[in-house]
Swiss-Prot record:
Protein known as: Protein Frey
Example GO molecular function: protein-macromolecule adaptor activity
Species of provenance: Ailuropoda melanoleuca (Giant panda)
Disulfide bridges in this chain: none
Task performed by this protein: Key regulator for male fertility expressed transiently in round spermatids where it recruits IZUMO1 at the endoplasmic reticulum (ER) membrane and coordinates the oolemmal binding multimeric complex (IZUMO1 complex) assembly. Upon complete assembly of the IZUMO1 complex, its ER retention is released, facilitating IZUMO1 complex export to the acrosome. Through the interaction with SPPL2C, inhibits its intramembrane protease activity directly accessing the catalytic center of an I-CLiP.
Amino acid sequence: MVRTMPGALYPRAGLSLFLLYLVLAAVLLRPQPLRPQRSVPEEFSAPLELSQPLSGLVDDYGVRPKHPWPRGPRPLLSRAQQRKRDGPDMAEYYYNAHL
């Protein structure tokens, strides 16, 4: 078996491969446009300290939670610890059964 270059047997294939290489090289070696660097102006920079101290419950970043935890026992905690084999409470499904 005689090994030859692909372009020797199929001249059009060699030419199309060469053109493909040229197009890929032109696309990959083209300089990329630089993105404009956005900087924050001096007048928009935030103060390092708050003017008024926050009162109440805040986290490490000084953000107050929207819904703080309620005080006292949770009523659904005992119901959540039921066993699976106990089955559902049918009184919850038929709320008008006591009427």
